[in-house]
């Protein structure tokens, strides 16, 4: 569960290392985001000469959460970190590589590019 002020790792090579959630998109008073939800983030830590710099405000999709994802068979898939992938205005990833596993819940029409770039889909 990701909410406002949550710090997330960035799971791509966009140049950002850490981002902070500043808004959960989708509804006027929506409080939590889970895997596959789009959030508005601010870049808090970035590498030199990356595509993004500290202070940039961007959209991101949540790809891993410590809280985990509940599957229809009752199993829960949990991760060691909260991670997101940065998106451009067209909801496409701005990076060319994705680091770490992502879940099958991202396999909708919107995020197939992220699933295809990921090294492992759980």
UniProtKB/Swiss-Prot annotation:
Record protein name field: Large ribosomal subunit protein uL14
Keywords attached to this entry: Ribonucleoprotein, Ribosomal protein, RNA-binding, rRNA-binding
Presence of keyword Secreted: no
Keyword rRNA-binding listed: yes
NCBIfam families xrefs: rplN_bact
Entry's family note: Belongs to the universal ribosomal protein uL14 family.
Summary of subunit composition and partner proteins: Part of the 50S ribosomal subunit. Forms a cluster with proteins L3 and L19. In the 70S ribosome, L14 and L19 interact and together make contacts with the 16S rRNA in bridges B5 and B8.
Entry-linked SUPFAM superfamilies: Ribosomal protein L14
HAMAP family listed in its UniProt record: Ribosomal_uL14
